[in-house]
Amino acid sequence: MAGKIVIIFDFDRTLIEDDSDRWVFTRMDLTQLFRDLRPTLPWNSLMDRLLEEMHVLGKSIDDIADCLRGMPLHPSVVSVVKQAHALGCDLKVASDSNQFYIRTILEHYGIYSCFSEIITNPAVVDKGRLRIFPYHGSAAPHGCDLCPSNLCKGRIIEQIKVSLSESESKRLIYIGDGGNDFCPTLKLAAGDFVLPKKDFPLLSRISKNSNLVKAKVCEWNSSEDLAKILGKLIECMSNEDKISSSTTQL
């Protein structure tokens, strides 16, 4: 009954070991420019500006892709993603990274096809350079005070819930680490789960606002830990659904 489970992964420092934006600009020797511009631009616009500088410096799309393929993704996470997909779980990514970075890394590790949806900032190639645009454009602001202007993950969870079939109940597992993962956590129901990373902002915000969180909380502190917890959780939820289904049929 794993087909009744929807798993939403944050990307940076959750599904992958590091932050994809920082991974690229540090390896392209743009850390100082990042520091200079950080106070003046929102993150999404800053990343687009750094990509412009990479293009000026002669870095190609292939150079960026090669850099991304060096991003660590723990084998245990690759394994649990494949396992969850094989069991029928609906896997999605909700991230403030971008389509190009996420697709390149997931394809490199052979798990891109395991995900039904990648919800993130769009990326396009324009005259030989990579451009990043906000998921929520300025023409239609999301109005959420908890999230950056370009992406509200809480709204994404709401959209996922609306898209689910009313004829079959689904349970959500949300996995994240950052402060922008708190808003989607608040959209989860009592039968759902949130998996925050230990010693990161999401867990801190949950701890300070536990009365607002309806979902069950399961902490993790490493990729191996996450894979074990997620695997066991899928098994337990599947067994619960089987028992519930059998009881209903009696």
What is each PLM-predicted segment?
Residues M1-A2, D145:
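Generic detector of short alpha-helix boundary/capping microenvironments
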Residues A2-P122, D126:
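Alpha-helical substrate-recognition element adjacent to the catalytic core
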